[in-house]
């Protein structure tokens, strides 16, 4: 069950309660369940549960990374704006967007977001833990991330 924080707005708390009720029982562990509830809350799509797959322990590792100071890196300013208030009031996590690293003009065959993601990943992954990526609506950022992971980044 998701822990309700003192700062959670009553409308948010009620929304999560209704989402949980509509979803019914799942086989997800508590952290995975919270991810699902947040995704449904953000998208309004109750069918997302059937599409989610988690690597065992991924949520625990992500939470530990956040507790260790990992940055949340988003593909869009809109995604950053959506998660920044909760990130700030829970663990004080810094939220940044790949657009901070994006060139003014994308090279031919690429996008500003894809170039920005690669630059941000390389910059933020240095001596610290890699950033946690939140991809909202830029498919080229996701494609570049998958390329980086495949290359061993």
Mark where each language-model region is.
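Short, solvent-exposed amphipathic alpha-helical segments in soluble enzyme
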Residues: 83-91, 147-153
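Short glycine-rich anion-binding loops that position phosphate/pyrophosphate groups of nucleotides
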Residues: 45, 77-79, 137-140
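Glycine-rich phosphate-binding loops that contact phosphosugars or nucleotide phosphates
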Residues: 112, 117, 121-128, 134-153
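General beta-strand structural signal in soluble alpha/beta enzymes
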Residues: 72-74, 97, 134-135
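Flexible, glycine/proline-enriched loop segments at strand-loop-helix junctions
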Residues: 2-6, 49, 107, 129-135
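Electropositive, gly/pro-rich neighborhoods at or near active sites that engage anionic ligands
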Residues: 2-73, 81
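Short, well-ordered, mixed-charge alpha-helical segments that flank or form enzyme active sites
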Residues: 81-82, 104-106, 141-144
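Long, charge-dense
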Residues: 87-130
């Amino acid at each position: 069950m998701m822990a309700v924080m003192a700062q959670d707005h009553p409308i948010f708390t009620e929304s999560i309660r209704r989402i949980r009720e509509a979803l019914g029982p799942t086989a997800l562990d508590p952290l995975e369940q919270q991810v699902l509830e947040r995704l449904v809350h953000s998208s309004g799509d109750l069918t997302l549960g059937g599409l989610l797959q988690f690597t065992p322990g991924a949520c625990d590792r992500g939470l530990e990374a956040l507790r260790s100071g990992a940055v949340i890196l988003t593909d869009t300013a809109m995604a950053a704006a959506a998660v920044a208030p909760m990130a700030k009031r829970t663990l004080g996590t810094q939220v940044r967007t790949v657009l901070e690293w994006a060139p003014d003009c994308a090279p031919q065959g690429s996008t500003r977001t894809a170039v920005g993601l690669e630059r941000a990943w390389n910059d933020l992954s240095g001596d610290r833990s890699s950033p946690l990526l939140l991809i909202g609506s830029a498919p080229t950022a996701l494609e570049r991330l998958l390329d980086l992971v495949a290359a061993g980044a």
